[in-house]
Regions:
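Bacterial N-terminal signal peptides
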Residues: 4-15
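Divalent-metal coordination cores built from histidine and acidic residues
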Residues: 31, 91-111, 116-251, 255-275, ...
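Histidine/acidic-residue-rich catalytic or RNA/ligand-binding cores of hydrolases
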Residues: 111-114, 148-149, 179, 236-238, ...
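His/Asp/Glu-enriched, well-ordered alpha-helical/loop segment
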Residues: 272, 356-443
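Glycine-enriched alpha-helix->loop->beta-strand junction motifs that scaffold or abut catalytic
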Residues: 291-298, 323-330, 371-373, 400
Length: 468
């Protein structure tokens, strides 16, 4: 019955568009769903090639044994015996990868009439991502209350199918931030559902109100806190026509949203409650504030803390400073919101001197050269879900090896997830969740294979199989 109901969502009609346009997937294709629970005897997957993020190589002729939702064993076919009665899935002509992880999506960005509609809208986008091979998603802030928390819990309870989720709930911005329509409207921590603005993010005007915002989100059960640290689309308003992010002489405008003290309060309160903090900052003082406050994941990083193109030594020093727990800080750069009409607008605003996309390329290359660990986050929102993998091609074009690009969405991405989820996904090994993806070709020789996922398994359940 579930399959029949979901089939009504539509037929997949995604078409990859040309460079500098935003590719968009059609409705989720529920006809791909298998949804058969693994038999008591387990499942055996024959993998012709198995990508190993640790070595960056393909292991050939492998067998993956699955019991319930976990990997029971994995290794060469001559060592791993297939139990009698096990369901055998033959992917001997394909490349199998760990389930992909997208550490930056927005499942609910449109105004919704109520929380129920918001959750169903988010489910539709989450299923597109799952069908494309992304078995774990991190929602980096979705407006209109805490519907993503309810969606996460419904998936975990098996009420609806979907990827694994970690969610941030409503983003944190100060009152009067540029995402509000003018005049600014005071709203209690994003709970005004249906209000016609891009995101309801609160009334944070002091360190104590910043702590209160974190406590509120913790009460509702989020996994992460998301800060909007720079009002990066200043100069016309995103996504309105005519907006720009540059001065006429080509300098990027990055207005800090919060003070250092407010950031420190957010990070301290979040860490006290076992939550991690992600910070949207394109550069300048806002990026510096985030890093000095100790955020777990800085996002975007288009220019340096001084506003320098290609970053500067001070930015690299702050990024390399170990976290409070002694671990190195990961970084994330998204391309989604930089591809499309923003190129033309940025060129116009900067007098033809720069675009955010061009600056992102320079910064990406510097971060990789400095040895900082990049994690994949597409930035997909109301368009783009299910089409994220095209971004891997840019990373390879910018100097990464295909193996490095794949690590961004597997082992690297897993490592920074909150709680213990990171130790259960991202690598195909004994004891981890049986989250698998397969493509017909070899992404180590053609990274665009990731755009043509043919097989998806999450927790031992097949959600898509075009390799039968």
């Amino acid at each position: 019955m579930l399959l029949k109901t979901m089939t009504a969502l539509g037929v997949l009609a995604g078409v990859l568009c040309a460079q500098n346009t935003r590719p968009e997937a059609g409705p989720f294709n529920a006809s791909h769903l298998d949804m058969q629970p693994p038999p008591a005897q387990g499942v055996a997957v024959r993998a012709g090639r198995l990508f190993d993020p640790k070595s960056g190589k393909n292991l050939v002729n492998q067998v993956i044994l699955i019991q319930g939702d976990r990997i029971a064993d994995v290794g060469p076919a001559e060592r791993v015996a297939i139990p009698q009665g096990a369901r055998v899935i033959d992917l001997s002509r394909a490349t199998v990868l760990p389930g992909l992880i997208d550490r930056h999506v927005h499942l609910i960005q449109d105004a919704q009439v109520n929380d129920g509609r918001a959750a169903l809208t988010g489910l539709n986008y989450a299923l597109k991502d799952l069908s494309a091979g992304f078995t774990t998603l991190q929602d980096m802030g979705s407006a209109f209350s805490y519907a993503t928390v309810e969606l996460r819990d419904a998936i975990n309870k098996g009420l609806v199918p979907g990827p694994r989720l970690q969610v941030a709930g409503p983003q944190i911005n100060p009152r009067g931030a540029n995402y509000y329509p003018a005049p600014s409207a005071a709203m209690p921590f994003g709970l005004n559902t249906g209000y016609n603005n891009w995101q309801n993010t609160g009334n944070v005007n002091s360190p104590w109100l910043a702590r209160a915002a974190v406590r509120d989100r913790s009460h509702y059960g989020v996994d992460w806190i998301k800060i909007y640290e720079t009002e990066d689309y200043e100069g016309g308003g995103y996504p309105g026509q005519g907006g720009g992010a540059f001065t006429p002489d080509g300098k990027m405008i990055n207005v800090p949203s919060l003070t250092l003290e407010e950031n420190q309060a957010i990070v301290d309160e979040a860490h006290r409650r076992g939550l991690k903090v992600a910070c949207h900052a394109y550069g300048g003082e806002g990026l510096r504030n985030c890093l000095e406050a100790g955020v777990d994941l800085p996002i975007h990083i288009i220019v340096g803390v001084t506003g320098a193109a290609g970053l500067d030594d001070e930015t690299i020093r702050l990024l390399k400073k170990p976290m409070a727990d002694g671990k190195p800080r990961q970084v994330q750069q998204t391309l989604w919101d930089l591809i499309g009409d923003l190129e033309e607008r940025d060129l116009k605003a900067s007098g033809g001197r720069a675009t955010r996309f061009q600056l992102s390329e320079k910064s990406f290359k510097r971060l990789v050269a400095e040895g900082l660990e990049e994690v994949f986050g597409s930035g997909a929102y109301t368009v783009g879900h299910g089409m994220q993998a095209f971004q891997f091609g840019y990373f390879v074009k910018w100097g990464m090896t295909p193996a490095q690009a794949l690590r961004m969405a597997t082992s690297n991405a897993a490592e920074g997830l909150n709680f213990d989820l990171g130790r259960q996904v991202g690598i195909v090994e004994k004891g981890r969740f049986a989250d698998l993806v397969a493509v017909a070709g070899d992404p180590l020789t053609d990274i665009t294979e990731t755009e043509r996922v043919k097989f998806v398994m999450k927790g031992g359940v097949v959600f898509r199989n075009e390799l039968k």
